[in-house]
């Protein structure tokens, strides 16, 4: 598989009035095309900061971040899915999904048809004229994912996208999001505090240290099952959980 994302000795230092704070130090890892990679680590270690660097929202103090061999910011399409769905309450589901197309100036008939195709494919077409407050939390997150997919990004950046959901809904939506991402053959980078979530969804897991964040270890969980819920039933699931738990305590 081709390396789609590469971080090479990336460091980030914040300047304050009285001090210099190292947030990230010599961080290196890669993600292949089509992989689902999770970033996990202690609270406050800089996981979301890493996503911001990949997205080009922050500039590293040193090191390189390459997407498809090009520097971040080279007009490479990235999709960002946040903790909250960020759906506009005054717009219908259909109009919410068209929003990225409008912002990017690519609101063409072809792209709008693709948006409706995604709604149809993932069984949300009957809700296209509904408003966000008429949908459950899980359905809203599915809509948010489709909105992220509609402009065909190379990489999806997922920042704790399930954290606002209750436990039962979280498992179900996690399963749905995983299946959609795999069906669309997308590369995904997930930031999560949930070890089980990382193990069940990921082809690769990057474990970070406390700040300044460095790569502590990398895991490739190979589990039986075609979905996160099924993978949680694998006999090796507990072994990976114990190993990663020990890395974090």
What are these regions (language model features)?
Residues 150-154:
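A short, proline-enriched helix->beta-strand linker immediately N-terminal to the Walker B motif
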Residues 102, 109-127, 179:
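Conserved ABC ATPase "signature" region
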Residues 63-74:
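Conserved ABC transporter NBD signature motif
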Residues 55:
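Helix-to-loop junction immediately C-terminal to a conserved catalytic motif
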């Amino acid at each position: 598989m081709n390396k789609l994302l590469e971080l090479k000795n990336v460091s980030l230092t914040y300047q304050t009035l009285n001090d210099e704070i190292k947030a990230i130090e010599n961080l290196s890892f890669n993600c292949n095309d089509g992989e689902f990679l999770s970033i996990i680590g202690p609270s406050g270690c800089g996981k979301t900061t890493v996503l911001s660097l990949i997205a080009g929202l922050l500039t590293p103090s040193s090191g390189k971040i390459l997407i498809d061999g090009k520097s971040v910011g080279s007009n490479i399409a990235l999709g960002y899915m946040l903790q909250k769905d960020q759906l506009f309450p005054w717009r219908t589901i259909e109009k919410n999904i068209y929003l990225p197309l409008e912002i990017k100036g690519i609101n063409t008939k072809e792209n709008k048809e693709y948006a409706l195709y995604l709604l149809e494919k993932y069984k949300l077409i009957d809700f296209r004229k509904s408003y966000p407050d008429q949908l459950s939390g899980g359905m809203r997150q599915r809509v948010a994912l489709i909105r992220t997919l509609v402009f065909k990004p190379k990489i999806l950046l997922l920042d704790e996208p399930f954290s606002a959901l209750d436990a039962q809904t979280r498992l179900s939506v996690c399963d749905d999001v995983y299946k959609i991402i795999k069906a669309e053959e997308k590369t995904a980078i997930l930031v999560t505090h949930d070890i089980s979530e990382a193990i069940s969804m990921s082809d690769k897991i990057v474990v970070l240290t406390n700040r300044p964040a460095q790569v502590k270890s990398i895991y490739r969980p190979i589990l039986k099952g075609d979905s996160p819920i099924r993978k949680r039933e694998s006999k090796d699931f507990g072994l990976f959980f114990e190993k990663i738990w020990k890395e974090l305590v």
